[in-house]
Amino acid sequence: MPLRADLQQSCRIKYIKIPEVARMLHIPDDTPVWTDDFRILTREQLNIPALHMIGHAHFQAAGAKLDTHFHCNMEFVVVLKGKQQYIVDGKLYTLYGNDIFMTYPYENHGSGGGSQDVCEFIWFQFDMSSSQNFLGLVPPYSEYLFRQLLNYRHRTKKANMKDLPVLQRAFQLLGSEEISQQIQGYSYFLQFVTNNICTTDIELTREVYSTDIQEAIYYIHTHLMEDLNIEIIAGHCGLSASRFKAKFKEELGITPHAYITSLKVDTAKIFLKDPGNTITDVAYQLNFSSSNHFSSVFRKYTGCTPTYFRNHRFSNIY
């Protein structure tokens, strides 16, 4: 698919002065970006009323921390793979594949003191200033979607796993130079929004995990200091190893091995707060084969070494 020629600029950020409020970082997301791991389509490129932007990020190694900031629009983040963390009003939200995360206009959020994790996600923003011609629709459809978003109260919820490829396809087609493909992308985007965000459901949260996968998660958390074997975890849940791995990834959007490793890294951050724990102590407490192996994994998931993390007190959010 040919890529649009105007997608080569870098994103900019700016400060907005707000009376009687501490100076806050505003990220307008109004400049096109098109790199291997970070892409943004702006409202001028999209030509869809009220859709301020849509972006795609694919971090294959830990990235820089996301500073606390706000947008003037309602923002949704849909995690496709891996793990992502955000802090809003001092509360930490940990997201995995298939999770949807929402922030309101002008609401401060960021990744806290830590780096962004290995993950892939799509995010988009709605301009909620008017229901007229919302998302290019006419009444009653425009008013229905606008009203559903105004009444949206889920900080996090689960997306339908089958709709994730729909959202990915929407982004790909919206970035095309062909108008016919842009129209298809618009259709796919509306399909995802109506099926997963502008719904009439009362509660769609992490409780959708099946009983056996909930058992696996509990087992992993309670045996984290041990040598966690996939076959043993699968047997504990009454599943074959192959079925367990497939079902775990289907429901969490991340492999059991990646989930365990990520959890061990988060636990290591807590252990590193204790000056009595050496790097080697932490490595062996969490069953890494060596301190070098631990340091290598820690760096991949956080973007820094355990020593650097400890010295700079990045663990203050845990």
Predicted segment positions?
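Short, charged, solvent-exposed linker or helix-capping segments at domain edges/interfaces
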Residues: 132-140
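Basic/polar phosphate-binding segments, predominantly the helix-turn-helix DNA-binding elements
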Residues: 200, 221, 226-265, 277, ...
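Pre-recognition alpha-helix immediately N-terminal to the DNA-recognition helix
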Residues: 211-219, 260, 264-270
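Ligand-binding loop in jelly-roll beta-barrel domains
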Residues: 106-131
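Generic protein-terminus/edge-of-domain signal
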Residues: 1-100, 107, 115, 140-144, ...
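An amphipathic alpha-helical interaction segment
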Residues: 122-124, 129-133, 150-218
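Short, locally clustered residues in the helix-turn-helix/winged-helix DNA-binding domain
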Residues: 80, 197, 221-225, 269-273
